[in-house]
């Protein structure tokens, strides 16, 4: 009898141990996920959209936090949110014309307002506003019809729900800290994520934000990311996961995000030191003007040339550019943003071959420009017009067979030393956004 009890106990411990190993085993992406990663890495250009009831205040997406408005007073804005000029098809047409390959939309930002018909809360655009239309659903349909990949932004934090354990933001909205209930909030999030991944067709990626809200906690906060990531991958194995946490990648993630910075840099100051760059597909998100959400006084839009040069430098780092627009409260995209999209689209129709499907070149971006690679061809993007008529030295890794001006038959003389260093003179040319050389290995 004692022997049987010992054997039963040993079997139980073995089962428990096996379960523990299974739960902590490193994430292994599926074949569908790996294909999705490769497709994503080739896209190079996407559009980010920050839109919610915060657009009505015209002060950016952090208005609730920055103003210290009571959450109940803020929520009254939903009663008047009626974006009658919203047309998902027109949005997607503008993005495709701009050369974008995917769209990332804020389904729910830090203010907690959901932009779809969610059963997990009545604080959403269908139930809490007179608009009564499912924006996520309409955008998803438009994207699928146009063969545009749809990514969904989802905030891990909430400045209005009392069950969310507040971190360093959202402390002046009238929430009662003693009512925090992480288990309840975590269940709420997973219910919403399940809706997003089961109601709107194929989702290219889930883009998380808010991890940084607890980066000052004395005891590290457990976001329980891995179980949530596993749930997403079970629902849609090809769905990529990215998290704007400003840290090294976490187990279960499929892409690495850099906010307002090129990969590996920290000019925006979001991390104490430059985050290590992983071997995952990379994405840089950047605003078209100064804010993510609509801000009426922010008319400091980047020029077409600046956006193109940002795209070039991002591609030169082997990353995608996710360019943000804050739609107006009436549902229209700002006229200046549309103008910039048209300009970028015109450039990409002429030179997209040097961007789409490329990887980083032999040199990282330089003050004069950047290099992208496709097969045995490297595209040298010279964005500094001051180099016209002057010599340029390139540190390359392979022997060069020819150098020509992209899109022409003009061959350029060059010299290459034994250590593969290439020297040539840039032809004189009129001022241009990007003078491109085609270097064949």
Task: State each model region's role.
Residues 23-441:
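Mature catalytic domains of secreted/periplasmic carbohydrate-active enzymes
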Residues 1-24:
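Bacterial Sec-dependent N-terminal signal peptides
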């Amino acid at each position: 009898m004692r022997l049987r009890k010992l054997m039963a106990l040993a079997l139980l411990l073995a089962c428990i141990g096996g379960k523990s190993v299974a739960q902590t085993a490193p994430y292994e992406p599926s074949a569908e996920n790996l294909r999705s990663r490769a497709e994503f890495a080739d896209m190079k250009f996407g559009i980010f959209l920050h839109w919610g009831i915060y657009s009505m205040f015209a002060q950016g997406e952090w208005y609730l936090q920055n103003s210290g408005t009571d959450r109940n007073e803020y929520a009254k804005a939903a009663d008047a949110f009626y974006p009658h000029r919203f047309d998902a098809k027109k949005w997607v047409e503008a993005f495709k014309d701009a050369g974008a390959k995917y769209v990332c939309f804020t389904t729910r930002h830090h203010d907690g307002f959901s932009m779809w018909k969610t059963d997990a809360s009545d604080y959403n655009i269908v139930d809490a506003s007179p608009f009564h239309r499912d924006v996520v659903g309409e955008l998803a349909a438009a994207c699928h019809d146009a063969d545009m990949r749809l990514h969904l932004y989802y905030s891990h934090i909430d400045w209005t729900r009392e069950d969310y354990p507040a971190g360093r933001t959202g402390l002046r909205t009238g929430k009662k800290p003693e009512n925090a209930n992480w288990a309840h909030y975590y269940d709420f999030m997973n219910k919403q994520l399940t809706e997003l991944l089961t109601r709107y067709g194929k989702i290219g990626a889930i883009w998380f934000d808010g991890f940084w809200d607890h980066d000052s906690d004395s005891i590290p906060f457990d976001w329980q990311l891995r179980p949530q990531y596993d749930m997403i991958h079970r629902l849609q194995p090809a769905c990529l996961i990215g998290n704007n946490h400003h840290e090294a990648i976490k187990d279960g993630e499929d892409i690495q995000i850099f906010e307002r910075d090129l990969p590996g840099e920290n000019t925006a100051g979001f991390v104490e030191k430059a985050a290590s760059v992983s071997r995952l597909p990379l994405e840089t998100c950047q605003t078209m003007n100064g804010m993510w959400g609509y801000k009426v006084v922010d008319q400091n839009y980047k020029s077409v040339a600046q956006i193109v040069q940002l795209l070039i430098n991002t591609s030169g780092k082997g990353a995608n550019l996710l360019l943000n627009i804050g739609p107006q409260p009436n549902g229209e995209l700002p006229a200046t943003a549309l103008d910039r999209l048209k300009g970028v689209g015109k450039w990409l129709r002429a030179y997209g071959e040097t961007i789409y499907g490329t990887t980083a070149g032999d040199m990282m971006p330089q003050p004069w420009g950047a290099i992208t690679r496709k097969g045995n061809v490297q595209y040298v993007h010279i964005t500094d017009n001051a180099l016209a008529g002057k010599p340029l030295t390139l540190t390359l890794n392979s022997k060069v067979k020819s150098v020509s001006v992209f899109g022409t038959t003009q061959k350029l003389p060059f010299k290459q030393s034994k250590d593969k260093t290439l020297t040539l003179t840039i032809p004189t040319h009129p001022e241009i956004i990007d003078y491109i050389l085609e270097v064949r290995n």
